[in-house]
């Protein structure tokens, strides 16, 4: 049974209504404001977690108690509830006020000036907000995001338990392994020169649970990756709904999340409509070709068309020898200034330029690169299926660059054109059949594209053919899948490779032999040699999910105590230097410190 009444209060600041008029009550909270309107007469606002209540000071003794208090002091007030003369319909407590008879200061605010106005903290500089996060969180708007996070996590936990999953925690101190991002390392005092790693994900542990005979596992798992921040990615640590199922394939995983997520999104989201099950399945290659992204926003009805054959030889320099992609928009009413901004935004986000022309109501090619398109108008109109009044946005470059730029262009145009985007809904889809391998941007060598523990389509046979040169490794797809909602990647998952022979063969293609696999993944390799069930899983990002539900653009808005973009905790002063004694105990010598870098 929930109770809000404590030793310090009989009611909360969001609780009092007309039925309480005439009662003597005790409230406790933060002094949000005091406004003097006459001699010994003032209005005060008391705020707690639950709401605000107006307090009316009407005598000298009470005014003396309030007069010397700074905003944000915590006080206990005992007084009588009465009906307001001037009601405030915007507040749940707007029909009443409290006339205090006794005031006790519980925690005095010793600062005459606050770093920012509490109720407008979101307008303040982010560094100030993060340094004084305990003040920022007093803002109801900021606080409500954290409440939403708690509600969503509770709903996810209940849903998974109802589906027969067991919540099992896995180790935080583990071994370093090559999972993609940089590890956070923890030195061992007892074993000089050796290090633990904070887990990038519970990947190996959850697979080992399946090998141990558990059927369904989940946890709200902390994950640690030393990677740069983005708007939808927090540096350092994040949380995911980690889950795994034994004797299951990807359709079994899909069925669980398709049952769990839509009602949670409809209940807690900004929008009340969520796409029903089954979610649409889109192959990775189709997504890149038609949407220019492996996380397409399906609320936008625009698609990408290949225009290489139609425009590659039009004489426009950037198109020559490159892939050309087009996004055709009907009913476009943007001005030249707005078009220029759209193109500039595409270049900033994708690193590639965007181009354009119109097919006007008179059937003429005008604007942008029209002079290059006009001579081949009929062929272009036919190839792109243009109707009079169309706007055509274009990108060009190597295949992947042109695709990604077109994806950004599609998103920008969709957001700009209300008739092409149904914003007020949650549109889910599964992206499937990801490439198993890719050529690394830095190494120029074959690398795993996503999860190295995924089962390849074609199994051992396709890997052996690739090793023999009979199949291009880049053509191999894996049983890997992403869950996407409104253009946000919520989760990645896969059918796991549970056969040690297939595991070794998969790693050999990226220049790691059987001995390397045994050395880097000893527990999992050995466990699988004892027989392991086919298993599959997924791990939706909790932070990213709540960000989407809250309608926020920055993931820091839904994390109680986030780091800044430079992976610094400004409130706690982390990372920080430690004492020489601590370093000596760990047998660590620092060869370079941050001041050295600043001096260079």
Annotate each predicted stretch with a short phrase.
Residues 1-600:
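Class II aminoacyl-tRNA synthetase catalytic cores and aaRS-like
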């Amino acid at each position: 049974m929930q109770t809000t009444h404590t030793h310090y209060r009989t009611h909360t600041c969001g609780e009092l209504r007309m039925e309480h008029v005439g009662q003597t009550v005790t409230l406790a909270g933060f002094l949000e404001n005091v406004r003097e309107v006459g001699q010994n007469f003032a209005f005060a606002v008391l705020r707690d977690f639950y709401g605000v209540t107006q307090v009316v000071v009407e005598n000298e003794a009470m005014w003396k108690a309030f007069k010397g208090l700074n905003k944000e002091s915590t006080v206990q007030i005992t007084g009588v509830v009465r009906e307001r003369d001037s009601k405030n319909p915007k507040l749940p407590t707007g029909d009443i006020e409290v006339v205090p008879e006794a005031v006790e200061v519980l925690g005095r605010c010793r600062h005459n000036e606050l770093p920012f106005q509490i109720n407008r903290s979101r307008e303040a500089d982010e560094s100030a907000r993060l340094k004084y996060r305990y003040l920022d969180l007093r803002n109801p708007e900021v606080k409500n995001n954290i409440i939403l996070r708690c509600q969503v996590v509770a709903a996810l936990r209940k849903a998974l338990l109802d589906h027969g999953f067991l919540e099992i925690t896995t180790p935080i101190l583990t071994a370093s392994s090559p999972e993609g991002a940089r590890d956070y390392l923890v030195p061992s005092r007892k074993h000089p020169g050796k290090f633990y790693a904070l887990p990038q994900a519970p990947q190996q542990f959850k697979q080992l649970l399946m090998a141990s005979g558990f059927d369904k596992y989940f946890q709200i798992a902390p994950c640690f990756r030393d990677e740069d921040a983005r708007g939808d990615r927090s540096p350092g640590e994040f949380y995911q709904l980690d889950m795994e199922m034994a004797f299951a394939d990807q359709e079994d995983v899909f069925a669980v999340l398709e049952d769990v997520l839509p009602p949670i999104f409809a209940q807690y989201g900004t929008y009340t409509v969520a796409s029903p099950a089954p979610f649409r399945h889109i192959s990775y290659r189709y997504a890149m070709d038609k949407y220019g992204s492996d996380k397409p926003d399906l609320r936008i009805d625009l698609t990408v068309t290949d225009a290489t054959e139609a425009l590659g030889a039009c004489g426009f320099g950037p198109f020559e020898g490159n892939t050309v992609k087009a996004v055709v928009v009907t009913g476009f009413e943007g001005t030249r200034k707005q078009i220029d901004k759209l193109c500039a935004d595409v270049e900033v986000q994708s690193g590639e330029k965007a181009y354009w022309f119109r097919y006007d109501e008179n059937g003429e090619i005008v604007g942008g690169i029209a002079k290059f398109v006009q001579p081949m108008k009929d062929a272009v109109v036919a190839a792109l299926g243009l109707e009079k009044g169309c706007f055509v946005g274009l990108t060009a470059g190597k295949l992947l660059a042109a695709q990604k730029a077109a994806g950004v262009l599609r998103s920008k145009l969709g957001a700009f054109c209300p008739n092409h985007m149904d914003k007020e809904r949650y549109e889910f889809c599964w992206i499937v059949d990801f490439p198993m391998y890719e050529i690394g941007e830095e190494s120029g060598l074959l690398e795993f594209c996503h999860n190295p523990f995924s089962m390849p389509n074609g199994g051992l046979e396709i890997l052996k053919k690739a090793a023999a040169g009979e199949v291009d490794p880049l053509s191999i797809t894996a049983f890997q899948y992403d869950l996407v909602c409104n253009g946000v990647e919520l989760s990645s998952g896969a059918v796991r490779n549970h056969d040690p022979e297939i595991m070794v063969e998969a790693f050999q293609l990226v220049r790691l032999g059987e001995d390397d696999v045994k050395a880097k993944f000893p527990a999992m390799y050995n466990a699988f040699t004892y027989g392991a069930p086919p298993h599959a899983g997924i791990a939706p990002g909790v932070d990213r999910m709540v960000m989407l539900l809250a309608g926020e653009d920055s993931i820091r808005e839904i994390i109680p105590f986030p780091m800044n973009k430079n992976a610094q905790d400004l409130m706690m002063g982390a990372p920080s230097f430690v004492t020489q004694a601590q370093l000596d105990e760990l047998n660590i010598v620092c060869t370079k410190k941050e001041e050295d870098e600043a001096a260079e």
